[in-house]
Amino acid sequence: MKRSMYAGRVREEHIGQEITLKGWVGRRRDLGGLIFIDLRDREGIMQLVINPEKVSAEVMATAESLRSEFVIEVTGQVAAREQANDKLPTGAVELNVTALIVLNTAKTTPFEIKDGIEANDDTRLRYRYLDLRRPEMLENLKLRAKVTHSIRNYLDELEFIDVETPFLSKSTPEGARDYLVPSRVNKGHFYALPQSPQITKQLLMNAGFDRYYQIVKCFRDEDLRGDRQPEFTQVDLETSFLTEQEIQDITEGLIARVMKETKGIEVTLPFPRMKYDDAMALYGSDKPDTRFDMLLQDLTEVVKGVDFKVFSEAPAVKAIVVKGAADNYSRKDIDKMTEVAKQYGAKGLAWVKVVDGELNGPVAKFLTGIQEELTTALALEDKDLVLFVADTLEVANATLGALRGRIAKELGLIDNDKFNFLWVVDWPMFEWSEEEGRYMSAHHPFTLPQEETAHELEGDLAKVRAIAYDIVLNGYELGGGSLRINQKDLQERMFKALGFSTEEANDQFGFLLEAMDYGFPPHGGLAIGLDRFVMLLAGEENIREVIAFPKNNKATDPMTQAPSTVALKQLEELSLQVEEDETNKTN
């Protein structure tokens, strides 16, 4: 029979109606001769009642055979429950079953289909189709669908054009490692899966599309963590003839629309703006979490005269004050934080506690001469804990920024109901890579430098500033964008500053440089990480929770066993040969 409605949508208004439902058996209970079944579908749970006095022996026998995750079809009359269940939207009603058909049986599942399960991540991914039956996973993916629907409607209203760009593109040396695809037709040549549609969307501006968008898969072969996947989705925008502010206004409107339509939250516009240098100085991060205080304090000048060379001779000394937390952290706890500090390049972590108005701790004796000045500078009160890092400015900022976030989580200082958006602007154009031994693009090599610093492309690259902007939410980079270079000579200067020879630039980006000979308009854009945005809206801590079929931290899929080996014939067709792993050679 045709399904009348979803099980999770039956309400009191349907009492007295005969309906047909289809779904999965959640659980079965036998009470006083009656059989109660929780029928589950994507919209929720409906209680079924099978009364032996009102159904045939065949229906009763079928009901007794039901097990969890059997797929069934039931017909019956909606009735009011004697005792309502306020925890369920369907809790005021039940279905008195008159007909029951088993559409399919099921083996015992490797974990219960319910929220809050304790199965490990790989088991969940191995049986992802079962994991996705759980209500919280269904809700996460329904939220994702609502977000993309809201985004499309908003951009369509602003006359953006949805254009698909190629997945088989050219490998470029900047950024993360590419996923490479060998060409069978052009032996020895490789495509790359795009890390973003950056160049193709710029070329669409040269083609006169004016406003482009795409919700698009991108690929990066990089080490994974909770908010990264090898394949991810971004909301990609590009516009012609707009200023930095106009692009940000459009982005803020998009986010405001999504927040209102999916969370019922009215966000305050415009978003705050923070310079990159201020973000690093005050928060120790280029993606500051502004939901709590504990700002970094610069004490370099304050401690210059102390008889403690670690402080007095350090390039920078910075600190954070953990208010009222002296009793929360033992020496053992601080030792653990010291190990964290070392992971960020710090040589150690100094600390004092304020106890009865005096400084206590390993370095307190060196600070007695400046206690009053230190107390004033840091606004110290009894029971405060102060953590110091003496190192380069970059190391001090990064270390204390990491500790700031860790401590805030441990002490419950973060209001998880807050959504604090802000723009980080005035970025450096380049960042030094110790691994590469040279300056690299902080964003990408197509970013427009600020006019007043562009002359440093042939001088001190550390002084070049970009017309770039990142949108940050609760300590996560939600997205980033910039105005782009549209003048050929400036683009060539940029490539040269990055160490490209003329030949290398033409080999890698000759098509883009050629396009700049044909009236390339001023343009700029932005990309928002959809997975990360939905993760934050859903209150999750890992983007796997908002992606239907993600990879694990080893970039593998436990369900399909991807990536896998392939037949020798397939490799031969591609003129490829796989070298045996050294560990296998010795076994």
UniProtKB/Swiss-Prot annotation:
- Entry-linked PROSITE patterns: AA_TRNA_LIGASE_II
Presence of keyword DNA-binding: no
A Pfam family (short name) is GAD
Q: Partners and quaternary state?
A: Homodimer.
Q: Where is this region: Aspartate?
A: 198-201
Instruction: Could you list this entry's UniProt keywords, alphabetically sorted.
Output: Aminoacyl-tRNA synthetase, ATP-binding, Cytoplasm, Ligase, Nucleotide-binding, Protein biosynthesis
What functional role does this protein have? Answer: Catalyzes the attachment of L-aspartate to tRNA(Asp) in a two-step reaction: L-aspartate is first activated by ATP to form Asp-AMP and then transferred to the acceptor end of tRNA(Asp).
Which cellular compartments is it found in?
Answer: Cytoplasm
Instruction: Name the enzyme's class.
Output: ligase
Q: Which residues bind L-aspartate?
A: E174, R220, H443, R484
Which reaction(s) are listed as its catalytic activity? Answer: tRNA(Asp) + L-aspartate + ATP = L-aspartyl-tRNA(Asp) + AMP + diphosphate
What is this protein's name?
Answer: Aspartate--tRNA ligase
PANTHER family attached here? ASPARTATE--TRNA LIGASE, MITOCHONDRIAL (PTHR22594:SF5), ASPARTYL/LYSYL-TRNA SYNTHETASE (PTHR22594)
The taxonomic lineage of its organism, from the top, reads: Bacteria, Bacillati, Bacillota, Bacilli, Lactobacillales
**GO terms for biological process, alphabetical:** aspartyl-tRNA aminoacylation
Residues recorded as binding ATP, renumbered to this chain, are R220, D221, E222, Q229, E477, G529, L530, D531, R532
Q: Identify its protein family.
A: Belongs to the class-II aminoacyl-tRNA synthetase family. Type 1 subfamily.
